[in-house]
Structures are given as structure tokens and as C-alpha cells.
Amino acid sequence: MFKTEYHFEVKKRDWLLVVRLFGEIDHHGAVTLREDLDRLILKERPRRLVLDLSLIEFMDSAGLGLLMGRYRLMQDIGGVMVLSRPNQRIMKILRLSGMERFMEIEGVGAKGEQEDEAR
């Protein structure tokens, strides 16, 4: 696990890379997070990158830029990026930005709603 103003956990299986992000994605930590994610992506070269947003509490325009840049990087290396489990607040930001029209997003909903659906 890497730690700065944010932190994340990484799980890798074959050509799948799952990155679970915690906390906030804002202008304070976006540059360092971007650098760490880019290093990880270029080292592992996954075919599928899943960014688990279920524990993201806040995201601003720097966070949107971070997501867009990783989306493009994955396209450049021939892979795909999926956003997983954004809460309702983060999903609203993704909708307003237009990202939901071209990014694959799975498991939308508040954490409590997702747990209820799993039962």
C-alpha cells in the first residue's frame, strides 16, 4: 500500500489490476496519486484496470482529471479502465462531467445499498 494524502490497495490477477482508493481525490493529492498510478500501470501493463471508488468520500475537478488521464493511459497501452462502485455523490459528479457516457461504470450506489443488494 502506498500512502500520502490518499492511499490505495492493489490486487493483481493475471491481466486484471484492481486499485481500491480511499479518502479524497482532490488537488492536494491528485499529482502524487497520478504519478503513483501511472508508475503502477506502466509497470504492470494490465489489460483491465478497475478503480474501486467505493471508499472515496470526495472528489473535485482534479480528481476528474486524474480519472480521465488514467482512462487515456489505459487506451494508449491497449487496455480498458472501469470505475467500480462509486457512491451516489461521486456518481453525480461523473454524470455532470459527462464521463458516464464513455467510461464503463459498474456497481453504482451507496455502500449500504450495495450491501443490501448482495444479500
Give the residues covered by each predicted segment.
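STAS-like cytosolic regulatory interaction modules
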Residues: 1-56, 72-119
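Conserved TIR/SEFIR loop-to-helix hotspot centered on a Trp-containing motif
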Residues: 59
